[in-house]
Amino acid sequence: MPRYLGLMSGTSLDGMDIVLIEQGDRTTLLASHYLPMPAGLREDILALCVPGPDEIARAAEVEQRWVALAAQGVRELLLQQQMSPDEVRAIGSHGQTIRHEPARHFTVQIGNPALLAELTGIDVVADFRRRDVAAGGQGAPLVPAFHQALFGDDDTSRAVLNIGGFSNVSLLSPGKPVRGFDCGPGNVLMDAWIHHQRGEHFDRDGAWAASGQVNHALLASLLADEFFAARGPKSTGRERFNLPWLQEHLARHPALPAADIQATLLELSARSISESLLDAQPDCEEVLVCGGGAFNTALMKRLAMLMPEARVASTDEYGIPPAWMEGMAFAWLAHRFLERLPGNCPDVTGALGPRTLGALYPA
Protein backbone atom coordinates (compact mmCIF):
# COMPACT_ATOMS: atom_id res chain seq x y z
CA MET A 1 0.00 0.00 0.00
CA PRO A 2 1.28 3.51 -0.77
CA ARG A 3 2.92 5.58 1.91
CA TYR A 4 2.70 9.35 2.25
CA LEU A 5 4.29 12.00 4.40
CA GLY A 6 2.28 14.90 5.80
CA LEU A 7 3.79 18.21 6.90
CA MET A 8 1.91 20.62 9.14
CA SER A 9 2.99 23.89 10.70
CA GLY A 10 -0.07 25.60 12.10
CA THR A 11 -1.00 29.03 13.39
CA SER A 12 0.41 28.30 16.84
CA LEU A 13 3.90 28.24 15.25
CA ASP A 14 5.26 25.98 17.97
CA GLY A 15 6.90 23.60 15.54
CA MET A 16 6.57 21.33 12.54
CA ASP A 17 4.76 18.00 12.54
CA ILE A 18 5.96 15.31 10.13
CA VAL A 19 3.88 12.14 9.88
CA LEU A 20 4.09 8.97 7.82
CA ILE A 21 0.89 7.18 6.87
CA GLU A 22 -0.05 4.10 4.89
CA GLN A 23 -3.15 4.55 2.79
CA GLY A 24 -5.39 1.61 1.98
CA ASP A 25 -9.07 1.26 2.75
CA ARG A 26 -8.17 2.97 6.03
CA THR A 27 -5.49 5.48 6.95
CA THR A 28 -2.81 4.04 9.25
CA LEU A 29 -0.31 6.18 11.15
CA LEU A 30 3.12 4.55 10.86
CA ALA A 31 5.47 7.14 12.37
CA SER A 32 5.70 10.74 13.48
CA HIS A 33 8.37 13.31 14.14
CA TYR A 34 8.39 16.84 15.56
CA LEU A 35 10.81 19.72 15.13
CA PRO A 36 10.48 22.81 17.34
CA MET A 37 10.18 26.08 15.46
CA PRO A 38 13.37 28.14 15.87
CA ALA A 39 12.56 31.35 17.74
CA GLY A 40 13.91 33.62 15.01
CA LEU A 41 11.94 31.87 12.29
CA ARG A 42 8.79 32.01 14.41
CA GLU A 43 9.14 35.76 14.93
CA ASP A 44 9.82 36.39 11.24
CA ILE A 45 6.73 34.37 10.24
CA LEU A 46 4.60 36.30 12.73
CA ALA A 47 5.88 39.56 11.26
CA LEU A 48 4.62 38.45 7.83
CA CYS A 49 1.10 37.96 9.21
CA VAL A 50 0.61 41.74 9.36
CA PRO A 51 1.32 44.40 6.72
CA GLY A 52 4.92 45.63 6.64
CA PRO A 53 7.74 46.82 4.38
CA ASP A 54 9.45 44.72 1.71
CA GLU A 55 7.02 41.83 2.23
CA ILE A 56 7.80 39.96 -0.99
CA ALA A 57 11.54 39.70 -0.33
CA ARG A 58 11.02 38.90 3.35
CA ALA A 59 8.49 36.17 2.53
CA ALA A 60 10.84 34.62 -0.04
CA GLU A 61 13.71 34.57 2.47
CA VAL A 62 11.58 33.20 5.30
CA GLU A 63 10.18 30.37 3.21
CA GLN A 64 13.71 29.19 2.33
CA ARG A 65 14.32 28.69 6.05
CA TRP A 66 10.91 27.07 6.53
CA VAL A 67 11.61 24.59 3.70
CA ALA A 68 15.06 23.80 5.10
CA LEU A 69 13.41 22.90 8.42
CA ALA A 70 10.76 20.80 6.65
CA ALA A 71 13.36 18.92 4.60
CA GLN A 72 15.39 18.28 7.76
CA GLY A 73 12.31 16.81 9.43
CA VAL A 74 11.61 14.55 6.45
CA ARG A 75 15.20 13.29 6.37
CA GLU A 76 15.20 12.60 10.11
CA LEU A 77 11.92 10.66 10.00
CA LEU A 78 13.07 8.56 7.04
CA LEU A 79 16.35 7.84 8.83
CA GLN A 80 14.48 6.74 11.96
CA GLN A 81 12.32 4.42 9.86
CA GLN A 82 15.25 3.18 7.75
CA MET A 83 13.37 4.19 4.61
CA SER A 84 14.51 5.73 1.36
CA PRO A 85 12.71 8.61 -0.40
CA ASP A 86 11.53 6.32 -3.21
CA GLU A 87 9.42 4.39 -0.69
CA VAL A 88 7.20 7.47 -0.22
CA ARG A 89 4.67 8.21 -2.94
CA ALA A 90 4.35 11.90 -2.08
CA ILE A 91 4.59 14.57 0.60
CA GLY A 92 1.43 16.51 1.42
CA SER A 93 2.69 19.91 2.57
CA HIS A 94 0.30 22.45 4.02
CA GLY A 95 2.92 25.19 4.01
CA GLN A 96 2.78 28.09 6.46
CA THR A 97 -0.21 30.41 6.37
CA ILE A 98 0.77 34.08 6.50
CA ARG A 99 -2.54 35.59 5.34
CA HIS A 100 -6.03 34.12 5.20
CA GLU A 101 -8.72 36.51 3.99
CA PRO A 102 -11.49 34.57 2.26
CA ALA A 103 -13.78 37.62 2.25
CA ARG A 104 -11.22 39.18 -0.11
CA HIS A 105 -10.93 35.88 -2.00
CA PHE A 106 -7.36 34.99 -1.12
CA THR A 107 -5.29 32.83 1.18
CA VAL A 108 -1.49 32.73 1.22
CA GLN A 109 0.70 29.85 2.37
CA ILE A 110 4.46 30.01 1.92
CA GLY A 111 6.54 26.84 1.66
CA ASN A 112 8.21 26.62 -1.79
CA PRO A 113 7.10 23.07 -2.67
CA ALA A 114 9.45 22.98 -5.67
CA LEU A 115 12.44 23.43 -3.37
CA LEU A 116 11.01 20.89 -0.91
CA ALA A 117 10.79 18.33 -3.73
CA GLU A 118 14.38 19.12 -4.73
CA LEU A 119 15.74 18.80 -1.20
CA THR A 120 13.91 15.58 -0.33
CA GLY A 121 13.79 13.74 -3.65
CA ILE A 122 10.06 13.12 -3.11
CA ASP A 123 7.10 14.43 -5.13
CA VAL A 124 5.27 17.18 -3.24
CA VAL A 125 1.56 18.01 -3.32
CA ALA A 126 0.88 21.48 -1.92
CA ASP A 127 -1.25 24.63 -2.32
CA PHE A 128 -4.43 22.91 -1.13
CA ARG A 129 -6.43 25.89 0.08
CA ARG A 130 -6.42 28.12 -2.99
CA ARG A 131 -8.33 25.60 -5.11
CA ASP A 132 -11.26 25.77 -2.70
CA VAL A 133 -11.09 29.57 -2.58
CA ALA A 134 -11.07 29.65 -6.39
CA ALA A 135 -14.37 27.73 -6.27
CA GLY A 136 -15.91 30.36 -4.00
CA GLY A 137 -15.07 28.64 -0.72
CA GLN A 138 -13.41 29.76 2.48
CA GLY A 139 -10.39 27.52 1.89
CA ALA A 140 -10.83 26.30 5.47
CA PRO A 141 -11.32 24.16 7.36
CA LEU A 142 -10.06 21.36 5.12
CA VAL A 143 -9.78 18.56 7.69
CA PRO A 144 -13.52 17.69 7.92
CA ALA A 145 -13.33 15.38 4.88
CA PHE A 146 -10.56 13.44 6.63
CA HIS A 147 -12.51 13.40 9.89
CA GLN A 148 -15.47 11.96 7.99
CA ALA A 149 -13.24 9.23 6.53
CA LEU A 150 -11.94 8.32 9.99
CA PHE A 151 -14.98 8.67 12.22
CA GLY A 152 -18.11 8.99 10.09
CA ASP A 153 -19.03 5.37 9.48
CA ASP A 154 -21.40 4.56 12.35
CA ASP A 155 -24.69 5.80 13.80
CA THR A 156 -23.23 8.19 16.37
CA SER A 157 -23.90 11.93 16.16
CA ARG A 158 -20.33 13.09 16.60
CA ALA A 159 -18.17 16.19 16.36
CA VAL A 160 -14.43 16.23 15.80
CA LEU A 161 -12.95 19.34 17.36
CA ASN A 162 -9.50 20.55 16.38
CA ILE A 163 -8.03 23.08 18.80
CA GLY A 164 -4.84 24.58 17.45
CA GLY A 165 -4.14 28.29 17.26
CA PHE A 166 -7.75 28.47 16.11
CA SER A 167 -10.52 25.98 16.72
CA ASN A 168 -12.57 24.27 14.04
CA VAL A 169 -15.20 21.60 14.21
CA SER A 170 -16.38 18.83 11.90
CA LEU A 171 -19.99 17.77 12.44
CA LEU A 172 -20.65 14.14 11.57
CA SER A 173 -24.35 13.27 11.63
CA PRO A 174 -25.57 9.88 10.36
CA GLY A 175 -27.11 10.17 6.91
CA LYS A 176 -26.12 13.81 6.42
CA PRO A 177 -23.26 15.55 4.59
CA VAL A 178 -20.36 16.51 6.82
CA ARG A 179 -20.55 20.12 8.01
CA GLY A 180 -17.99 22.26 9.78
CA PHE A 181 -16.56 25.71 10.41
CA ASP A 182 -14.01 27.66 12.41
CA CYS A 183 -15.30 28.43 15.91
CA GLY A 184 -12.80 31.18 16.73
CA PRO A 185 -9.57 31.50 18.72
CA GLY A 186 -8.33 28.22 20.15
CA ASN A 187 -4.93 28.67 21.76
CA VAL A 188 -3.80 31.74 19.84
CA LEU A 189 -4.87 34.43 22.32
CA MET A 190 -3.88 32.42 25.40
CA ASP A 191 -0.46 31.78 23.84
CA ALA A 192 -0.04 35.44 22.90
CA TRP A 193 -1.03 36.67 26.36
CA ILE A 194 1.22 34.32 28.35
CA HIS A 195 4.12 35.16 26.04
CA HIS A 196 3.44 38.89 26.46
CA GLN A 197 3.23 38.62 30.25
CA ARG A 198 5.60 35.80 31.17
CA GLY A 199 7.72 35.03 28.12
CA GLU A 200 6.32 31.50 27.87
CA HIS A 201 5.02 30.05 24.61
CA PHE A 202 1.93 28.31 26.02
CA ASP A 203 -0.02 27.76 29.23
CA ARG A 204 0.88 24.19 30.22
CA ASP A 205 -2.28 22.29 31.22
CA GLY A 206 -4.08 25.65 31.38
CA ALA A 207 -2.63 26.05 34.88
CA TRP A 208 -2.21 29.83 34.72
CA ALA A 209 -5.75 30.26 33.40
CA ALA A 210 -7.05 27.99 36.16
CA SER A 211 -5.40 30.25 38.76
CA GLY A 212 -7.44 33.27 37.66
CA GLN A 213 -11.09 34.31 37.65
CA VAL A 214 -13.18 34.92 34.55
CA ASN A 215 -14.06 38.60 34.09
CA HIS A 216 -17.54 38.51 32.63
CA ALA A 217 -17.54 42.11 31.42
CA LEU A 218 -14.39 41.48 29.39
CA LEU A 219 -15.77 38.15 28.17
CA ALA A 220 -18.96 39.83 26.93
CA SER A 221 -16.88 42.45 25.12
CA LEU A 222 -14.79 39.79 23.39
CA LEU A 223 -17.81 37.68 22.43
CA ALA A 224 -19.46 40.74 20.88
CA ASP A 225 -17.13 40.43 17.89
CA GLU A 226 -19.35 39.82 14.87
CA PHE A 227 -17.44 36.67 13.91
CA PHE A 228 -19.00 34.70 16.77
CA ALA A 229 -22.58 35.49 15.71
CA ALA A 230 -21.96 34.58 12.06
CA ARG A 231 -23.17 31.23 10.80
CA GLY A 232 -20.97 28.86 8.82
CA PRO A 233 -19.36 28.50 6.38
CA LYS A 234 -16.80 30.72 8.10
CA SER A 235 -13.08 30.74 8.82
CA THR A 236 -10.70 33.09 10.55
CA GLY A 237 -7.06 33.68 11.41
CA ARG A 238 -4.48 35.98 12.93
CA GLU A 239 -5.70 38.82 10.72
CA ARG A 240 -8.72 39.11 13.03
CA PHE A 241 -7.79 37.65 16.41
CA ASN A 242 -4.39 38.72 17.73
CA LEU A 243 -2.70 40.48 20.65
CA PRO A 244 -3.55 44.02 19.42
CA TRP A 245 -7.22 42.97 19.13
CA LEU A 246 -7.12 41.80 22.75
CA GLN A 247 -5.33 44.94 23.90
CA GLU A 248 -7.98 47.13 22.26
CA HIS A 249 -10.61 45.38 24.36
CA LEU A 250 -8.50 45.55 27.52
CA ALA A 251 -8.16 49.33 27.10
CA ARG A 252 -11.95 49.65 27.52
CA HIS A 253 -11.92 47.98 30.94
CA PRO A 254 -10.34 48.72 34.32
CA ALA A 255 -6.95 47.11 34.87
CA LEU A 256 -7.31 43.39 35.54
CA PRO A 257 -4.94 40.81 37.01
CA ALA A 258 -3.04 39.09 34.22
CA ALA A 259 -4.20 35.64 35.38
CA ASP A 260 -7.83 36.79 35.21
CA ILE A 261 -7.31 37.83 31.60
CA GLN A 262 -5.89 34.38 30.84
CA ALA A 263 -8.86 32.74 32.55
CA THR A 264 -11.19 34.90 30.46
CA LEU A 265 -9.39 33.93 27.25
CA LEU A 266 -9.76 30.25 28.10
CA GLU A 267 -13.46 30.83 28.71
CA LEU A 268 -13.70 32.65 25.36
CA SER A 269 -12.27 29.61 23.60
CA ALA A 270 -14.52 27.19 25.49
CA ARG A 271 -17.68 29.24 25.02
CA SER A 272 -17.13 30.00 21.34
CA ILE A 273 -16.60 26.28 20.73
CA SER A 274 -19.48 24.92 22.80
CA GLU A 275 -22.07 27.48 21.74
CA SER A 276 -21.37 27.24 18.02
CA LEU A 277 -21.11 23.44 18.13
CA LEU A 278 -24.34 22.85 20.04
CA ASP A 279 -26.19 25.45 17.99
CA ALA A 280 -25.26 23.57 14.80
CA GLN A 281 -25.58 20.03 16.21
CA PRO A 282 -27.78 20.02 19.34
CA ASP A 283 -28.02 16.20 19.37
CA CYS A 284 -24.24 15.72 19.50
CA GLU A 285 -23.37 12.61 21.53
CA GLU A 286 -19.58 12.68 21.37
CA VAL A 287 -16.92 15.36 20.90
CA LEU A 288 -13.49 14.04 19.90
CA VAL A 289 -10.74 16.59 20.48
CA CYS A 290 -7.43 16.84 18.63
CA GLY A 291 -4.73 19.46 18.30
CA GLY A 292 -2.72 21.08 21.06
CA GLY A 293 -5.85 22.06 22.96
CA ALA A 294 -6.46 18.40 23.76
CA PHE A 295 -3.52 18.67 26.19
CA ASN A 296 -4.95 21.73 27.99
CA THR A 297 -6.49 20.05 31.02
CA ALA A 298 -8.39 23.14 32.16
CA LEU A 299 -9.88 23.72 28.71
CA MET A 300 -10.94 20.09 28.33
CA LYS A 301 -12.65 20.17 31.74
CA ARG A 302 -14.46 23.38 30.86
CA LEU A 303 -15.66 21.98 27.53
CA ALA A 304 -17.05 18.92 29.31
CA MET A 305 -18.94 21.19 31.73
CA LEU A 306 -20.38 23.31 28.91
CA MET A 307 -21.50 20.26 26.90
CA PRO A 308 -22.83 17.88 29.59
CA GLU A 309 -24.95 15.82 27.18
CA ALA A 310 -21.95 14.91 25.03
CA ARG A 311 -18.94 12.80 25.91
CA VAL A 312 -15.80 14.93 25.48
CA ALA A 313 -12.67 12.86 24.84
CA SER A 314 -9.35 12.89 23.02
CA THR A 315 -9.03 11.24 19.61
CA ASP A 316 -6.39 9.10 21.35
CA GLU A 317 -9.26 6.86 22.41
CA TYR A 318 -9.68 5.90 18.75
CA GLY A 319 -5.98 5.34 18.17
CA ILE A 320 -5.31 8.74 16.60
CA PRO A 321 -2.86 10.79 18.70
CA PRO A 322 -4.29 14.33 18.83
CA ALA A 323 -0.96 15.97 18.01
CA TRP A 324 -0.69 14.23 14.62
CA MET A 325 -4.23 14.59 13.24
CA GLU A 326 -3.59 17.53 10.93
CA GLY A 327 -0.35 16.12 9.58
CA MET A 328 -2.20 12.91 8.78
CA ALA A 329 -4.93 14.93 7.07
CA PHE A 330 -2.52 16.59 4.64
CA ALA A 331 -0.83 13.29 3.85
CA TRP A 332 -4.33 11.96 3.09
CA LEU A 333 -5.10 15.02 0.94
CA ALA A 334 -1.96 14.29 -1.10
CA HIS A 335 -3.36 10.80 -1.73
CA ARG A 336 -6.72 12.29 -2.74
CA PHE A 337 -4.99 14.62 -5.20
CA LEU A 338 -2.97 11.86 -6.86
CA GLU A 339 -6.11 9.75 -7.22
CA ARG A 340 -7.99 12.80 -8.57
CA LEU A 341 -10.53 12.62 -5.75
CA PRO A 342 -12.15 15.63 -4.05
CA GLY A 343 -10.64 16.84 -0.79
CA ASN A 344 -13.00 19.60 0.26
CA CYS A 345 -16.52 19.52 1.70
CA PRO A 346 -18.69 22.17 0.01
CA ASP A 347 -21.10 22.27 2.96
CA VAL A 348 -18.12 23.17 5.15
CA THR A 349 -16.26 25.72 3.05
CA GLY A 350 -19.07 27.10 0.90
CA ALA A 351 -17.33 26.12 -2.35
CA LEU A 352 -19.44 25.65 -5.46
CA GLY A 353 -18.81 21.91 -5.37
CA PRO A 354 -16.31 19.14 -4.62
CA ARG A 355 -12.84 19.91 -5.91
CA THR A 356 -9.54 18.05 -6.13
CA LEU A 357 -7.22 20.16 -3.98
CA GLY A 358 -3.54 20.87 -4.50
CA ALA A 359 -0.84 21.02 -7.15
CA LEU A 360 1.98 18.59 -7.92
CA TYR A 361 5.69 19.43 -7.75
CA PRO A 362 7.62 16.40 -9.04
CA ALA A 363 10.99 15.56 -7.53
UniProtKB/Swiss-Prot annotation:
Keyword Disulfide bond applies: no
Top-rank EC class of the record's enzyme: transferase
Recorded phenotype for the gene knockout or disruption: Cells lacking this gene accumulate anhMurNAc. Deletion of this gene increases fosfomycin sensitivity. Growth rate is not affected.
Gene Ontology terms: biological process: 1,6-anhydro-N-acetyl-beta-muramic acid catabolic process; amino sugar metabolic process; peptidoglycan turnover; response to antibiotic
Binding site for ATP: G10, T11, S12, L13, D14, G15, M16, D17
UniProtKB keywords: Antibiotic resistance, ATP-binding, Carbohydrate metabolism, Kinase, Nucleotide-binding, Transferase
E.C. number(s) listed in UniProt: 2.7.1.170
InterPro entries: Anhydro_N_Ac-Mur_kinase, ATPase_NBD
Substrates-to-products reaction catalysed: 1,6-anhydro-N-acetyl-beta-muramate + ATP + H2O = N-acetyl-D-muramate 6-phosphate + ADP + H(+)
UniProt entry tagged with the keyword Chaperone: no
General function of this protein: Catalyzes the specific phosphorylation of 1,6-anhydro-N-acetylmuramic acid (anhMurNAc) with the simultaneous cleavage of the 1,6-anhydro ring, generating MurNAc-6-P. Is required for the utilization of anhMurNAc either imported from the medium or derived from its own cell wall murein, and thus plays a role in cell wall recycling. Contributes to intrinsic fosfomycin resistance in P.aeruginosa.
Name recorded for this polypeptide: Anhydro-N-acetylmuramic acid kinase
Organism: Pseudomonas aeruginosa (strain ATCC 15692 / DSM 22644 / CIP 104116 / JCM 14847 / LMG 12228 / 1C / PRS 101 / PAO1)
